[in-house]
Design a protein with these regions (language model features):
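Short, contiguous alpha-helical
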Residues: 4-7, 14, 18-33, 37-90, ...
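Active-site rim elements
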Residues: 12-17, 99-101
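Acidic/histidine-rich alpha-helical segments that form the ligand environment
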Residues: 88-131, 139-150
Length: 177
């Protein structure tokens, strides 16, 4: 079972931001616990056929990479991302042939890389990637707030998808440590 730990009740700004992001990240794995491979890839939202548990997990993995690796610390995209010039804007969600366990492991690994990338950076550090060159560099603080919102919003999607699949809702009991 995924360990879900509430963010610290009294922490500095950095601790709060990372704590809330890590909480939302843990919900991604939790929403997929016990799901069959078939259901992880099952399309239940007629108007959003890419919105499967597997598709959302893949989307969040690549958002982690894009915001923290590419944008913040300036790692160039040398073809490792699913996005190509002229390709589908949601290419990262085409994962029908990728096992959910692999997608979740890749997501966890990307989240760990994100945390490593930001470990020594002040919240006012700004992007070194493509947006910086265009004069639109966001701060680490902005990126953390955005990723909390992005991840939480998609966890809500996952909650709805899971409920439609097998009627499971909500969260498990959180550790108060």
């Amino acid at each position: 079972m995924t360990e879900v730990q509430r963010p610290p009740l009294t922490a500095d700004e950095r601790g709060q931001l990372i704590g809330w992001l890590d909480l939302q990240r843990s919900f991604v794995r939790m929403k997929c616990e016990g799901i069959s491979e078939e259901d992880a890839h099952r399309k239940v939202l007629e108007t959003s056929p890419l919105m499967t548990l597997a598709g959302v997990a893949a989307h969040l993995r690549w958002n982690e990479w894009s915001w923290f690796q590419k944008n913040l610390i300036g790692v160039p995209d040398t073809g490792q991302s699913p996005w190509t010039e002229g390709g589908h804007p949601d290419a990262e969600m085409f994962v029908d042939d990728v096992p959910i366990a692999q997608l979740l492991d890749e997501y966890d690994a990307e989240c760990a890389r994100s945390n490593e990338a930001i470990a020594g950076l002040p919240l006012d550090a700004t992007e070194q990637g493509p947006y910086a060159a265009a004069g639109e560099a966001a701060s680490l603080r902005y990126i953390l707030c955005h990723m909390i919102e992005e991840t939480a919003r998609h966890v809500g999607h996952m909650d709805i998808i899971r409920e439609l699949l097998d009627h499971k809702t909500g969260y498990t009991k959180m550790s108060l440590a």
